[in-house]
Amino acid sequence: MLDNVLRIATRQSPLALWQAHYVKDKLMASHPGLVVELVPMVTRGDVILDTPLAKVGGKGLFVKELEVALLENRADIAVHSMKDVPVEFPQGLGLVTICEREDPRDAFVSNNYDSLDALPAGSIVGTSSLRRQCQLAERRPDLIIRSLRGNVGTRLSKLDNGEYDAIILAVAGLKRLGLESRIRAALPPEISLPAVGQGAVGIECRLDDTRTRELLAALNHHETALRVTAERAMNTRLEGGCQVPIGSYAELIDGEIWLCALVGAPDGSQIIRGERRGAPQDAEQMGISLAEELLNNGAREILAEVYNGEAPA
């Protein structure tokens, strides 16, 4: 690798490429003279489109191939949507930078209805997420929830073709792709608690690559990193992947971290909720403590069913 070149491993979806270009532009602005190249790749999660993600199984469906490129020195960094990043990393790799968070909320998208509550009974709602599914089913058990896979453009096309009455997407993804006008309503966290890390972009690299880590330091956003640390600590203790019915959202309010989380049965019949408030330096411990509370209050049994009988210890 040339001293002035940095290679970014990225998925090829429009949203992934937006994220990679975002990081590229930030790096070049912070380090004039640096040449940044994109290394587009296809992941397992991009290829398996006819099966709900929860049934595909495995963690890191959208990141593994990028990590192999890092380990084989075909790329220097991998740029991820934080909600896709597993809680464990291959030996020698780690998450070193978290960029400033975009709006973390879920978006209600429909051509005919202004809000979730305006949908008539029996309406078909599309989502690929068990987390969204369980919260939708709890609030509106009279709706029909169907799996929805593919990139943002594909999902919107299926809505426009009449396959769904409404779909749920991430506000951040729509905004980044210039599709903010498609959002009928942003769902507040009390209606649809976001995924761990939703709206944040994370950067992974080889932990022994000091030069790259120094280049990335300027992109780290301290407040976002604190919030995501609390959310991910909770998820790690729950052994959650990106396809389990777990929601978590942390905010910094008046110098304190407020952390909310839930674990839900996919059919919405039971949702275990909890929250914590504490000092920023205790972010990780707060996440672990909240996870323990959820497990003790019934989340262990819910997750055992989702994980085919293998509950978190």
Curated annotation (Swiss-Prot):
Pfam families: Porphobil_deam, Porphobil_deamC. Its EC number is 2.5.1.61. One of its GO terms (biological process) is protoporphyrinogen IX biosynthetic process. This is Porphobilinogen deaminase. It is an enzyme of class 2 (transferase). Tetrapolymerization of the monopyrrole PBG into the hydroxymethylbilane pre-uroporphyrinogen in several discrete steps. GO terms for molecular function: hydroxymethylbilane synthase activity. Binds 1 dipyrromethane group covalently. Its cofactor is dipyrromethane. Belongs to the HMBS family. It comes from Shigella flexneri. It catalyses: 4 porphobilinogen + H2O = hydroxymethylbilane + 4 NH4(+). The porphobilinogen subunits are added to the dipyrromethane group. Monomer. Keywords: Porphyrin biosynthesis, Transferase. One of its GO terms (cellular component) is cytoplasm. The modification S-(dipyrrolylmethanemethyl)cysteine is found at residue 242. Pathway: Porphyrin-containing compound metabolism; protoporphyrin-IX biosynthesis; coproporphyrinogen-III from 5-aminolevulinate: step 2/4. It comes from the Bacteria.
